[in-house]
Amino acid sequence: MAEEFVQQRLTNNKVTIFVKFTCPFCRNALDILNKFSFKRGAYEIVDIKEFKPENKLHDYFEQITGGRTVPRIFFGKTSIGGYSDLLEIDNMDALGDILSSIGVLRTC
C-alpha cells in the first residue's frame, strides 16, 4: 500500500517532494524548490497526511532511500534525500543545472 502510494507519484521528468506542512525542514525545502519555475505537471508536493497509517509510509521511505524522515525528495524516480541534501546541492549552485538536465524547468 505504501509502495503504491509513493510509486504512482514518481515519474521521469518530474520532481516529487513528500512533506508534512507542519515540518520546518519541509517548508525550507519547499522554499528552495519554489525559487524555480517548473513546467506544468513537473513538480508535485505530496502531503503524507493523505496516507494512513503514516508509519508504514516512513518504513517504505527507509526501505527505498535509507531515511524515514520528511521531506523525501525525488528527481524522477531517484531519491536525492532530504532537506540537507537539497540544501547542499543548492549551495553548490548545481540545483538549477540538475533541474534543467532532467527537463522540469520552464524555458522562456
Swiss-Prot record:
Record has Mitochondrion as a keyword: no
An annotated Gene Ontology molecular function: glutathione disulfide oxidoreductase activity
Cysteine pairings via disulfide bonds: C23-C26
Induction conditions: Expressed in the intermediate phase of the viral replicative cycle.
Coiled coil start-end: none
InterPro entries the UniProt entry points to: GLR_AS, GLRX1, Glutaredoxin, Glutaredoxin_euk/vir, Glutaredoxin_subgr, Thioredoxin-like_sf
Top-level taxon in the UniProt lineage: Viruses
GO cellular component terms, semicolon-separated: virion component
Function of the protein: Displays thioltransferase and dehydroascorbate reductase activities.
Family classification: Belongs to the glutaredoxin family.
UniProt protein name: Glutaredoxin-1
Origin species: Variola virus (isolate Human/India/Ind3/1967)
